[in-house]
Amino acid sequence: MFGLKATYFYLIAIQISLIKFFKKIYFTTNYYNKSLKSKIPKQIIFSPNPFLLTLISPYQKNSFKINEINVSEFWLENKNRNISDQHSFLWLNLIDRKIDRKNIQKIIYLWMLKYSSFKKGVWETSTLSSRLISWILNIDIIIDNGTFDFKNNFFQNIVTQCNHLKKNIKYEKDLIKKVETIVALSMSGIMFKEYEENFRLGIKELDKFINSYFDEDGFPLSRNPNDLIHFTKYMLLLSKSIKDAQQHVPDFLEDIIKKNLICIKLIKTPNDQIPFFNGGYENKLNSLDNYLNELKVNKKDKKNSVGGIFLAKSKQQVLFFDIGGPPSKSYSKNYQSGPLSFEYFLDGAKIITNCGFGKNISQKAELISRLTASQSTLTINDTSVTKFERNKVINRVFGNSIKSSFKTTQLNIQDDKNLTGCSVVHNGYEKNFNCTYKREIYLDHVSNKLLGKDYIFKKKDGIPIRYVFRFHLNPGLTAVKTMGGNSALIQISKNKSLIFTVENENIEIEKSIFLGGKKILENTCITISGNLVNKDKSFNWEIKKKI
């Protein structure tokens, strides 16, 4: 049975789905495709830096070799090929600019013969935007020594695809695609004098996007670290291109890029990744290294939390702790239900982890990775703190958004010469189980160890609950339960180990799975579990080096 809010989202989803259905039919008509044609630019007004494509391209060196491909067969339909991979042209950053020029021109010529009019998949918003950006950044080599007809046709194809984006940008609800569209349109506007209005439109839309989607620190309201990385890369690409064109970079764009980079620098882990909270998965940051190294973070910019992630560091230890509530439904399609979960590093090695977002593996892996049991935190009666939307119509439009919420309160931060950490409470289990959960977690600078204290506050209602605290170990680490039953030996390497200990409780060692990469990995999980009726309970635990 739908509640009022669910009914609203359902009706909106129905409306958007119907509009998309009829628009896709309309897009395939000759009338629509003719409407996309407009004035062909005479020339480009600046040569962009093609190496900026490395900011957004997922391709690594030697992963795509043009000279080993039969160019004439490049666009033959092949079920084993990913349409987005081919048609995005993000692989252009791998070409040998001296050897591959002729082949690139032929590949694009054949593409224009086959795909100049709208085709589902090939003209999907993200793929199309990436293609435009890739073409524009490599435009010098693409048109070099090309015939007049080839240049004209190529320019016309850029304009046609830009016009398609312009006609539909106001209907785009996916914020990732929105930013990609904005950057593609803006770059076309600084490339062609005849289409300067594209630049003005892009900057106007970008200003609105930034004002509505980032908090005061520059962190996305989705609380997703991967969103932060994605948006930063695209906005950096645009900013650098504007500078290369010797045009003024809007102050708001420079301001948000600086804030974004500060956030990334603060949450960057010792293994050069992002913490696995709220949609985070393995994401190489090497394309941002130069920008991060150049960035100087002033004292006023140093914060103990960004995006609802608490940060604590000592000489050898690093802690990331999820102290925030869930994002709003509109921004929650990648949210993982792991309030008060944490990740812990010692001597540069990751010890405690969340399972990561399974987006790059499968839909099932993505669903599993969103559950509370996949995070290093408390579950009660094997349920997730946040319930997720199951209605297929709503999910098709808004993604797998949340349908229930909770609050985090009573944040208390401690930072002195002995301890750095904090305590916080969430009420996610209050409605169903009459419980609230509090976690205190600190880096002990004196003893160089991690201290934790968990509390379950249970109302006296006579209803029993089953609690489980999970501590997921990073893949590659193993754990063995000790004879006492209340501790585990965590093996890091042949000559290095840690000891996990909990007072007056038994632990168990279980198998788990890690979903933050491109394939499922097995890992180990330390658990503390039991039953509770009509009383509160606290749990004291620590992780320290084995001497």
Labelled PLM ranges:
Residues 56-64, 310, 342-344, 454, ...:
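Short polybasic amphipathic segments
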Residues 79-257:
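Aromatic-lined, polymer-binding surfaces characteristic
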Residues 1-72:
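Extreme N-terminal leader/anchor segments
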Residues 87, 181, 308, 340, ...:
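Residues that flank catalytic or metal-binding motifs in active/ligand-binding sites
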Residues 123, 128, 332, 336, ...:
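Short alpha-helix boundary/capping segments
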Residues 2, 7-10, 129, 360-547:
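CBM-like, beta-strand-rich accessory domains located in the C-terminal region of large
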Residues 215, 219-353, 357:
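Carbohydrate-active enzyme catalytic cores, enriched for enzymes
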